[in-house]
Amino acid sequence: MRLPLPLLLLFGCRAILGSFGDRVSLSATAPTLDDEEKYASHMPTHLRCDACRAVAYQMGQHLAKAEAKSHTPDSSGSQELSESTYTDVLDRTCSQNWQSYGVQEVNQMKRLMGPGLSKGPEPSISVMITGGPWPNRLSMTCFHYLGEFGEDQIYEAYRQGHETLEALLCGGTHGSCSQEIPAQREEL
């Protein structure tokens, strides 16, 4: 008898928790999304820093994989990509499906979550909303940065390290992460 994965995980969690002798009650609720978060085609302002960091992470991961496959080391011995290669890699990065990202509520604040966005200890149980408008918003955000900075500048920043790439895309006086967004937004 084969059980579907969610049911298998539920039984596994119950078996683990039940084996400790004490009954532990866990509960989680999905974040409540406002109309902008549900329906707007753009990335909501309070999630732009997380989106930028996700884009920087994905660009770095894809460029690192491409360099590992490259067979042309530069003068320092590391793999340097040709302009056409890194341009193609960055374009494919932005065109990916972004399905591993979604919105989660952490400490009563909505955050974009996914690879490269972990900040401290994860809650013991949580619900993340994926799919919907989030993959398209992340793709549009990625292409926005390609247009704003260009592939050459992005690749040069990547070659100097992840922190430099993230600072280029997300930092600066007008960058998405330049100021802390208040946890509670005023309703109009």
Swiss-Prot record:
User: Could you tell me which PROSITE patterns the record lists for this protein?
Assistant: ER_TARGET (PS00014)
Species whose genome carries this gene: Rattus norvegicus (Rat)
Q: Where is the signal peptide?
A: 1-21
This protein's major location comes to endoplasmic reticulum
Its assembly, as annotated, is:
Part of the ER chaperone complex, a multi-protein complex in the endoplasmic reticulum containing a large number of molecular chaperones which associates with unassembled incompletely folded immunoglobulin heavy chains. Interacts with HSP90B1 and PDIA3 in a calcium-dependent manner.
Name of the protein: Marginal zone B- and B1-cell-specific protein
Where along the sequence do coiled-coil regions lie?
A: none
Does the keyword Disulfide bond feature in the UniProt annotation? yes
